[in-house]
């Protein structure tokens, strides 16, 4: 009997999900994206060749793996076509294996204009969005005025709906943000021009998942961003606009919760964050710079430098609980090579009180100071190690301590960017 497994980030994103999904899809029949949009940046390195995917599931580089974009994703037709063209130029037969839910909300040019105008208006209080229209598209979805992929295949219906929603957004752009209006005819023509290409890719994703379940196939659900950026459970308002947690795999694809057999939480051996928001273990000294330099911590979507800090076990415990995480994959262990000592955050101090769980909301979170437990580092290299017994003793102790604090096993360890630089202790599909 096959398994349905979820792979998601258990920190603030950028944990290395793309590589792990790519590795695990060797045993998968299909990979499903269920939330987010082209604000994701999943980096894969295969035989030294680097590929960055923003929208298309990471399984696209595995021959024969079906790739689906579920209804929970906000879809930019323009970004999708660009990514398809890049992959096809490299010989990847994207159209043979990519399938789209017609219930995907569309990201259109006015969403991008709104996103940029809002961030500019916030000034120093900016959230740090990617400026790609993700948030405004999700707003339209919740307010029930959004256009969906299925609308694109009905010219008159699409034009009528577009006219209504664009009147609304242009009023806001012009009269509130003092920005330029978005041209109706230009958006209409650009969108309809893509309909013929996209329509053959449409599939009833929930029904296909039911078929795969009945066939006993392995299916991977690929999360984007990370648990601490979840719209409900993250450090609100410094969050993304979707549910990045395991529950989002169900609502964003149409699979039932009892069909999920395993949840793999991806976590770096340290912690990073992009953009604004509280980050208790953030390092502002030479050590923070060292982690950023060794870990090549620059966003694959925005190019922005990531903030770096020590491992935060408090935040990870919350992520484990919210997602019912079955096992952890610890990535970038090799970045810690050569350090004399390491710090593990095992609690928070907020004023006179100490906490073993994160407080609710960004304001309270921002007042927390980390309570550290010091551990010895290791001088040996872990880069490319593929067997647990070949890891340095102190690296093993570090992983065992994380496992002990968090309460779930470390099932995988990543020791480098290539798919083969991985230690698999328990496979999600076995």
Swiss-Prot record:
SUPFAM superfamilies: P-loop containing nucleoside triphosphate hydrolases
Organism domain of life: Bacteria
Protein name: Adenylosuccinate synthetase
InterPro entries listed in its UniProt record: Adenylosuccin_syn_GTP-bd (IPR018220), Adenylosuccin_syn_Lys_AS (IPR033128), Adenylosuccinate_synth_dom1 (IPR042109), Adenylosuccinate_synth_dom2 (IPR042110), Adenylosuccinate_synth_dom3 (IPR042111), Adenylosuccinate_synthetase (IPR001114), P-loop_NTPase (IPR027417)
Any GO BP annotation: IMP metabolic process
Active site: 14, 42
Recorded name of the encoding gene: purA
Known cofactor(s): Mg(2+)
GO cellular-component term (any): cytoplasm
Location (main, coarse): cytoplasm
Native source organism of the sequence: Thioalkalivibrio sulfidiphilus (strain HL-EbGR7)
Residues that hold substrate according to the record: 300-306
Location in or out of the cell: Cytoplasm
Key word Cytoplasm present: yes
């Amino acid at each position: 009997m096959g398994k349905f497994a979820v792979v998601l980030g258990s920190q603030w994103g950028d944990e290395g999900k793309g590589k792990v999904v790519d590795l695990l899809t060797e045993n998968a029949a299909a990979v499903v994206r269920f939330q987010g949009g082209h604000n994701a940046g999943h980096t894969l390195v295969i035989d030294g060749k680097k590929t960055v995917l923003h929208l298309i599931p990471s399984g696209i580089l595995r021959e024969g793996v079906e790739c689906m974009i579920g209804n929970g994703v906000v879809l930019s037709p323009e970004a999708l076509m660009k990514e398809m063209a890049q992959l096809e130029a490299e010989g990847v037969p994207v159209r043979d294996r990519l399938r789209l839910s017609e219930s995907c909300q569309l990201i259109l040019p006015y969403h991008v204009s709104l996103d940029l105008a809002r961030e500019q208006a916030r000034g120093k209080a900016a959230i740090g969005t990617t400026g790609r229209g993700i948030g405004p598209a999700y707003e339209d979805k919740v307010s029930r005025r959004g256009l969906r992929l299925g609308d694109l295949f009905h010219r008159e219906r699409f034009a009528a709906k577009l006219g209504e929603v664009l009147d609304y957004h242009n009023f806001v752009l012009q009269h509130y943000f003092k920005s330029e209006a978005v041209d109706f005819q230009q958006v209409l023509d650009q969108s309809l021009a893509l309909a013929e290409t996209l329509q053959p890719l449409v599939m009833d994703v929930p029904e296909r998942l039911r078929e795969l379940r009945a066939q006993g196939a392995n299916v991977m659900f690929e999360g984007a961003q990370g648990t601490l950026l979840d719209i409900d459970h993250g450090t609100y308002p410094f969050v993304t606009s979707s549910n990045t947690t395991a529950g989002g795999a169900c609502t964003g694809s149409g699979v039932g919760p009892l069909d999920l057999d395993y949840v793999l939480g991806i976590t770096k051996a340290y912690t990073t964050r992009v953009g604004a928001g509280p980050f208790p273990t953030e390092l502002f000294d030479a050590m923070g710079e060292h982690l950023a330099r060794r870990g090549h911590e620059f966003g694959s979507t925005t190019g922005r430098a990531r903030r770096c800090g020590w491992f935060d076990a408090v935040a990870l415990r919350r992520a484990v609980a919210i997602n019912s995480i079955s096992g952890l994959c610890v990535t970038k262990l090799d970045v810690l090579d050569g350090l004399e000592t390491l710090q593990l955050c095992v609690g928070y101090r907020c004023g006179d009180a100490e906490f073993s769980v994160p407080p609710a909301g960004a304001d309270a979170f921002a007042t927390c100071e980390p309570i550290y437990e010091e551990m010895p580092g290791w001088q040996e290299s872990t880069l490319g190690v593929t067997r647990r017994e070949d890891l340095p003793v102190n690296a093993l102790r570090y992983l065992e301590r994380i496992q002990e604090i968090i309460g779930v096993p470390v099932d995988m360890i990543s020791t480098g960017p290539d798919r083969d630089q991985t230690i698999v202790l328990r496979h999600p599909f076995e």
